[in-house]
């Protein structure tokens, strides 16, 4: 596997409203663990759409990993131009920082938002251009990742395409592990 698409929930879907929320660190640890196994097996590119939440936290994880694995690259393919246009200023600044550090940035539709069809095109693009999908996603709480996860599963039924998930139970395990380590 050379290219993996990473996605997951938006912050508000997780009850997270600031990047210094303890849950963010937990999610980043889970992403790091999964991505590390893929990097050790030859992963070269992580692709995201630049969505707030899991995707931008994954970008931070990639930047941290690039210190030890300089061949690991991050590409941000936005579904449309200026997706950050209506975001709060601190979210825009954070997003722009991620874009400035990414190895490749492009827009899939090359135009500003016009319709939900652009999100569908984004999902198709990500599934076509990647070898696998990694999602912070739990089927019991579908949320925004639902559609790309469904597309990935459909592709997996007819081709050698894998979907990997970080479940809420995985995050709970990390929290318990941290509590155990801090108690010692």
From Swiss-Prot:
Pfam families: YpsA. InterPro entries: YspA. SUPFAM superfamilies: MCP/YpsA-like. Belongs to the UPF0398 family. This is UPF0398 protein BCB4264_A1614. It comes from Bacillus cereus (strain B4264). The lineage of its organism: Bacteria, Bacillati, Bacillota, Bacilli, Bacillales.
């Amino acid at each position: 596997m050379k290219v993996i698409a990473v996605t997951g929930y938006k912050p508000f879907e997780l009850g997270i409203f600031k990047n210094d929320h303890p849950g963010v660190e937990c999610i980043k640890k889970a992403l790091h663990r999964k991505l590390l196994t893929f990097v050790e097996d030859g992963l070269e590119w992580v692709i995201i759409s630049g969505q707030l939440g899991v995707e931008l936290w994954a970008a931070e994880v990639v930047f941290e990993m690039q210190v030890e694995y300089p061949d690991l690259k991050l590409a941000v393919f936005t579904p449309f131009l200026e997706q950050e246009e209506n975001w709060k200023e601190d979210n825009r600044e954070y997003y722009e920082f991620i874009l400035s550090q990414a190895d490749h940035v492009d827009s899939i539709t090359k135009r500003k938002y016009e319709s939900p069809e652009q999100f569908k095109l984004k999902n198709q693009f990500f599934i076509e251009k990647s070898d696998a999908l990694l999602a912070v996603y739990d089927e019991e709480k579908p949320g925004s990742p639902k559609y790309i996860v469904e597309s990935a599963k459909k592709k997996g039924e007819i081709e050698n395409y894998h979907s990997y998930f970080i479940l809420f139970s995985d995050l709970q395990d990390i929290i318990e592990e941290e509590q155990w380590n801090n108690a010692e």
